[in-house]
Amino acid sequence: MLMFKSKLKIINVILRIMPTNHKGNSGKFPNLASSRKGTYMQALNYPFDENYILSKKKKIKKELLESGRDFTDTRIAILGGSTTNDIKLVMELFLLDYGIKPSFYESEYNRYYQDAVFPNEELESFAPKIIYIHTTNRNITEYPKISDSPETIDELIKSEMLKFTSMWEILEEKYHCPIIQNNFEMPLYRLMGNKEASDIHGKINFINRLNEEFYKYAREHDNFYICDINYISADYGLKKWQEPFYWYMYKYALNVAAIPYLSYNVANIIKSLLGKNKKGFVLDLDNTLWGGIVGDDGVDNLEIGPEESGGQVYSEFQSYIKEHKDLGLVLNVASKNEEENAIAGLNHPDGVLKPDDFIEIRANWEPKDRNFSAIAESLTLLPESLVFVDDNPAERAIVAGNLKGVRAPEIGEAHNYIQTLDRSGFFEITNLSKDDLSRNEMYKENVKRAKLQASFDNYEDYLLSLEMVGTIKRFEPIYTARISQLSNKSNQFNLTTRRYTQTEIEEVMEDEAYIPLYGKLVDKFGDNGVVSIVIGHVVEEVCHIDLWLMSCRVLKRDMEFAMMDELVRLCKEKGVKQIKGYYYPTAKNNMVRDFYALQGFTKVSEDENGSTEWIFDITDDYKNKNNVITLQY
C-alpha cells in the first residue's frame, strides 16, 4: 500500500511538469482556467484545462466549500476495476460545483466484484445513495479466440454478462439505489485491422456486442444508468485516452490527464439524478441564432439557411436548440432589438426556430440581466435554472456576474456553439417522463392563464373561471418515476427538501404506515400533470409530514389546500389525531416559511437555524379549505 501511495505522488509530480497534450481542449485554450476572473471554481466550466484541474484540486475544493452555497449531501460508492483515487477526487470537485456535497466509499484496487457480491460490513454501514462501477475493457475476463465457434463466442458473451448482471442485481436488492455502470471503450489496437468490427472473433465486435447487452439491461431496468466511456474516449482521442504507461505503472485504465473528462461525465449523471439539471435557455438573437444584426442588415440579409456555409452553421445550431425543446426544455429570448425586428428575424423563411417555439421573447433595450430575471420570474423558475447563450462576452459577463448561479458558457465561434453547449452537461437526461415532454405546452398554457387573470378584479373568480379539476390519490406505479423526479427537482415550494430515489418512492408506496399522495391538476387550458406530492408517515396517532412539495407552475391555484383536505380525510380513516409538519430552511425555499400557519397549524418549536415544527389537531368539525378545484377520485 505504501508503494502504491508513492506512485500516486509520482503522478502528481508528472502532472506539474507534463505538457498539455490534448489538442481538442487545453491545447487550444492555454492557461484558460487561470484567466477566468481569477477564481479556481471557474476552471470547472467547459472547455476546461484538465491539467490545471488535476494540479489545483485542493485549492479548487477549498474555494467551493467556502462559497456559501447550499449543498445537497449524498453518499457515493465507487467500485473500481482499476485505480480510482483521482477519479474520485476530481468527481468531488464537479459535484461541489453543482451544489452536491458527496461522501465516498472507494473499493480497493480491482475489488469491485467482491465488494458488490460478498458481504462487506464497511460498504453496508456506508449505505450508498448512488453506486458507480468503474470498469473498462481491462476488466473483460476473456475474449474470443480465432478458433472459437459462434456458439462458443455466444457463451463467452453470456458468461461475461452473468458476471455483471449478478453483481447489479445483488447491489439493487441490497441498496435500492441508482447504479451507474461504465460501458466498454474500444481497444487500443486491432489485430485484424478493419475486420475487427465485423468478424465475430474480433475484440471490437465482441465489445460492441457486450455494450449492446449493457444497453438492453439499462432499457429494461429503472435506476440503472450507463456512463458512455466508449463515446467519451473517442471524443477525447482513443490513443491518448489509453496511455499504456499509466496502466503498467499505476493501474489507471485511462490517461491521468483524461480523468477530468470521465469524472465530469459521471458527475453530470449524478447531478441529473439529484434534480440539478438546468431547465432551459435564454438566447440572444443577432450573431447567435443567425448571422448578422437584423435591425441593421434586414431580414433578407441574415445568414441562415442552406444557401451558404455561414447560414448552414446557424441553421444547424437552431435545429440543435429545437431538439432540446422536444425534450421538454423551455426556450426564451433576451435580445437588444426592437420587438418587431426580432419577430421578423424569427419568421425568416429559412429559419428552423419560429416565434411559437419560445415561451418568452424579451426584445427591447433593457439590460439583459433584467430581461433574464423577468423571464425566470414569469416562468416561476429560479434564474439559475436557465442557461444564457450569447455571442457577446460582455453580455455573458454581466448576466453571469449579476445573477447568482446562472451559467453563461463561453461558446466561441459559431461553428463551435453546438460542441460547447453539448459538452457543458447542462441537460444530462437520466429519465424522461410524459410531463417532461409536455413542459413547453404547460408553460405556454400558463401564459394564457396570466392573460386571463389580468381581466379579473376578484382572484377567486379568476380561479373558478379556470374550471380546475384535480386528482389526488395514493402513489401509483405509473407515476413513481415522475414523483421521484419532482422530489429531486423541486426546491422553492418544498418544506423539507428530502430527496427520494424511485426505489424509495416504491417502498413508501407499498408501506401502509405511510400516506403518500400525488396531485394532478387539469384546467380549461390544459393538463399540468403531476404537480404536488405529500408523504405522511403515521406513527401511532400522529402523521409526520416527511415531504410536502409543489411545482411552481401551479402556485396560487389552491392545490395545496386540496392536498391538505385529502390528507386530513385519510388521516381520519386511519384514526390519526394529529398531523406534525416540519420546515427546514434552505437558500431557496423561503416562500414556504409560513406555509403551515396558512394551513392552520400551530408552531411548537424553532431552532437557531430557523427550522420549525408545527402541529395540527384533527377534529370532527374540520372544514375543507379548497373551494375552487373539483376533485376526481
Task: Give the location of each predicted region.
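A conserved beta-strand-loop-helix scaffold within acyl/acetyltransferase catalytic domains
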Residues: 475-543, 547-550
